[in-house]
Every structure is written in structure tokens, then in C-alpha cells.
Regions:
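Catalytic PLP-binding core of fold-type I/II PLP enzymes
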Residues: 151-183
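Conserved N-terminal alpha-helix of the aminotransferase class I/II PLP-enzyme fold
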Residues: 13-61, 83-84, 88, 94
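Conserved C-terminal alpha-helix-loop-beta "cap" of PLP-dependent enzymes
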Residues: 74-76, 268, 272-341
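PLP-dependent aminotransferase-class I/II
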Residues: 99-146, 151-158
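Active-site C-terminal subdomain of aminotransferase-like
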Residues: 109, 135-136, 142-145, 150, ...
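Hydrophobic beta-strand scaffold residues
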Residues: 79, 102-103, 170-172, 281, ...
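Conserved PLP-anchoring active-site segment centered on the Schiff-base-forming lysine
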Residues: 71-89, 118
Length: 341
């Protein structure tokens, strides 16, 4: 069965897995105080050109989103996100479970507009009863977005400017950051991203690691006492070395960026095949997620040979599905899918 339904169906990149094997018998202290975690943090600071950056490692994207947002907010605050943002529609209420409301504004192919953000905050404070409502305390965006689209440098800078004006932090979800940075249309570098937000995370789970996300506080200091706060969310690994070793490997010799390029190259090949077969795209995306409108009978036929992700109902006879590539996708996989299509 061909795997095109997501970018986390495989295990770890061989180099990451080898690093885990090579360090397996080393006794190391727990909870992220080991030498590999410290080395990984230093490599990430260097890659971000952020010598004063601080960071923590978390086990997965939901844990990263829920924990970081909780760290950023006071009990009476919520996080502003596009209505199509991951925390608004695909986190099963994890943010709300932690006591914070997701405050949604319009989304356009997965992205929010700075003007809508400014207007939302302005209207909030114009309300004479605002003390009786949930305060906008942080802003959440993702790179790439839930729809595989990208913020341009200018778009992200405009959102960041609103956040600075309003003195609220901007949090960038980078679960698929390797694939965003590798896209031809991306005009943001990793060091620039570190300058355009207050906190972001570098995705590992979808980008070559068995698990793990690296949270980077770049425009602000890490909140006080992160360890107990992470632990309260059930997101602290006793064997913190697990994430440290993996990110040490990912940020050695440019592996993280190589992983991104591999997924984008196969996504481009996939896009060509889908265009050649005459399928209609739900929207055009430059990253590793491709969204296509399939006749329901075609979806059923393809699923006999390949895993593809249901996205949403288009009409009575068509469905929007997601085809996804990853670091593990090969040209042979694309050729095999082309034969199925």
C-alpha cells in the first residue's frame, strides 16, 4: 500500500535512528538536562542565528501547541487564530481543555490577514464591556498552514507588527517547518523567522524524527520555570535525551534542510502527475500537501492501492482529499501512484 495520506507514516530518518542506536547505552541525566539536548539547543541557536534564544523540547505538536499557548497566556486570555488554523479545527479542543479559548478570525486559504487581526483587537478594546470577555493574549499562525500554504515575509512581518503594537506574543507552529522552508515560493529563512515572531517550534515528528518538537523562544525569554509547566501538561519526557539526540542529528550537516528538499521535490513531481491526469486542485500549494477534488468513485479506486486523506466533502459526488509527501517519499513511490491514477 502506497502511503500518501500524511507525513508521519514512517519511522525516523535513518541518520536519526542511527544516532539513537549509537547513543543508546550512554547513561545520561533525565528531563532534558543531558549533553545531547544541550548540544541540540546550541546547534539550533546557531541555525537560527539567535545566540540568546532559549528553548525546550516537547514530544509532539499537540503538546507543543497546548503547552506553549498556556505558557503565553494569563487565565483570562485566549489565543487568536485563523478559523482554519490547526488549533481551531484539528486539536480536539486541546487548547480549550487547558483553560484558554481559541478566538477565531477569517482565514484565507489557511492564512490570517494582519488587517483582520488589528481590527479584531481594536473592536475588542472599543467594547466598553471588554473586561467581561476573553482577552486576545497571543496570536497563533503556522508555517506551513493547515492548507499547505505559506506566509510571505511581508505578510508575517505585518502580523508581527500588529502583535508588537498590541504587546502580545506571536507564536508560529512549525510542525512542517522543514517543508515550508524548502518550498521554492518561501522567501523566509530560519534566521528571519526567528526575527519575525516571539516563539516558534521546529517540527520533528513530521520532519524525520520519531517524535519531538523544538520550541524556540526568540523574541522573548522563555517563561519562568518551564519544566513544571510542561509536566503539568503531561508533556515532559523523563528520557529527555530522546528528543535531544534526534534534534542533534537533524541539525548536523544540514540534515533538516535536506529532509525538506526531498519532500518538496517529490511533491512537485506528484503535482505534475495530478495535473497530467486532469484532476482539479482544491487550491494550489507550494509545499508537501496537495489538495485535489476527486470524484467519489476515483477516491474509492485509488484507496485500493494508496492511502490518501479525506479532507472535506466538496459536493454530493466529489470529495476533497489530501496527498502528502514526506522525507521518506521516493520517485518510485510517485511512479507507482501515477500508474494507479
Amino acid at each position: 500500500m502506497l502511503a500518501f495520506n500524511n507525513d508521519y507514516s514512517h519511522g525516523a530518518h535513518p541518520a536519526v535512528l542511527q544516532a539513537l542506536v549509537d547513543t543508546n547505552m550512554e547513561p545520561q541525566p533525565g528531563y532534558g538536562t543531558d549533553a545531547h539536548t544541550e548540544r541540540a539547543k546550541q546547534l539550533i541557536r546557531e541555525a537560527c542565528q539567535a545566540p540568546d534564544g532559549d528553548g525546550v523540547f516537547l514530544v509532539g505538536g499537540t503538546q507543543a501547541n497546548a503547552t506553549v499557548i498556556d505558557m503565553l497566556l494569563a487565565p483570562y486570555e485566549g489565543v487568536v487564530a485563523a478559523e482554519t488554523g490547526h488549533v481551531a479545527c484539528h486539536e480536539a479542543g486541546a487548547i480549550e481543555f487547558g483553560g484558554h479559548k481559541v478566538l477565531t478570525i477569517p482565514g484565507y486559504e489557511g492564512k490570517m490577514h494582519a488587517e483582520d487581526l488589528e481590527n479584531y483587537i481594536q473592536v475588542f478594546y472599543e467594547n466598553e464591556s471588554y473586561e467581561h470577555t476573553v482577552f486576545p493574549g497571543a496570536v497563533y499562525v503556522s508555517l506551513s498552514t493547515e492548507y499547505g500554504t505559506l506566509y510571505s515575509k511581508a505578510e508575517l512581518a505585518a502580523i508581527h507588527a500588529v502583535c508588537q503594537k498590541r504587546e502580545i506574543p506571536l507564536f508560529v507552529d512549525g510542525a512542517r517547518l522543514a517543508y515550508a522552508l524548502a518550498a521554492d515560493e518561501c522567501d523566509i529563512t530560519l534566521p528571519e523567522l526567528a526575527q519575525l515572531c516571539d516563539v516558534f517550534y521546529i517540527g520533528g515528528t513530521k520532519c524525520g524524527a520519531l517524535c519531538g518538537e523544538a520550541v524556540v523562544f526568540c523574541g522573548m525569554h522563555a517563561p519562568a520555570h518551564p519544566i513544571p509547566r510542561i509536566k503539568q501538561h503531561g508533556a515532559l519526557l523523563a528520557k529527555g535525551r530522546l528528543t535531544g539526540v534526534q534534534f542533534e542529528a537533524l541539525f548536523t550537516d544540514g540534515l533538516y534542510f535536506e529532509i525538506g528538499r526531498q519532500a518538496i521535490e517529490t511533491a512537485q513531481a506528484l503535482r505534475r502527475v495530478l495535473h497530467e491526469r486532469g484532476y482539479q486542485f482544491f487550491l494550489e500549494t507550494p509545499t508537501n500537501q496537495q489538495f485535489v477534488i476527486l470524484p467519489n468513485e476515483d477516491m474509492a479506486r485509488i484507496r485500493e492501492h494508496a492511502s490518501i486523506e479525506y479532507w472535506e466533502k466538496y459536493d454530493e459526488t466529489h470529495t476533497v482529499v489530501r496527498f502528502c509527501t514526506s522525507w521518506a517519499t521516493t520517485q518510485e513511490d510517485i511512479d507507482a501512484l501515477a500508474a494507479v491514477l
